[in-house]
């Protein structure tokens, strides 16, 4: 069975954000506005996305 994936795009800057939020973006593989990553759809990834939801958007599930 194929694993479910989720595509995420960074829409906001990490400048003047707390270190934990910047680290979460790095953990998601994002570091510049406009970058997209396809990630495995797991509860831990969903939690990371929720933590920085003001800086990322879900492109497709």
Curated annotation (Swiss-Prot):
<dbReference type="GO" id="GO:0003735">
    <property type="term" value="F:structural constituent of ribosome"/>
</dbReference>
<dbReference type="GO" id="GO:0006412">
    <property type="term" value="P:translation"/>
</dbReference>
<keyword id="KW-0687">Ribonucleoprotein</keyword>
<protein>
    <recommendedName>
        <fullName>Large ribosomal subunit protein uL30</fullName>
    </recommendedName>
</protein>
<comment type="similarity">
    <text>Belongs to the universal ribosomal protein uL30 family.</text>
</comment>
<comment type="subunit">
    <text>Part of the 50S ribosomal subunit.</text>
</comment>
<dbReference type="InterPro" id="IPR005996">
    <property type="entry name" value="Ribosomal_uL30_bac-type"/>
</dbReference>
<dbReference type="Pfam" id="PF00327">
    <property type="entry name" value="Ribosomal_L30"/>
</dbReference>
<dbReference type="InterPro" id="IPR016082">
    <property type="entry name" value="Ribosomal_uL30_ferredoxin-like"/>
</dbReference>
<keyword id="KW-0689">Ribosomal protein</keyword>
<dbReference type="InterPro" id="IPR036919">
    <property type="entry name" value="Ribo_uL30_ferredoxin-like_sf"/>
</dbReference>
<dbReference type="GO" id="GO:0022625">
    <property type="term" value="C:cytosolic large ribosomal subunit"/>
</dbReference>
């Amino acid at each position: 069975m194929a694993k479910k994936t989720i595509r995420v795009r960074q829409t906001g800057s990490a400048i003047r954000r707390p270190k934990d939020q910047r680290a979460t973006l790095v953990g998601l593989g994002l570091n510049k506005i406009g970058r997209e990553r396809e990630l495995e759809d797991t509860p831990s990834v969903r939690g990371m996305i929720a933590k920085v939801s003001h800086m990322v958007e879900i492109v497709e599930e």
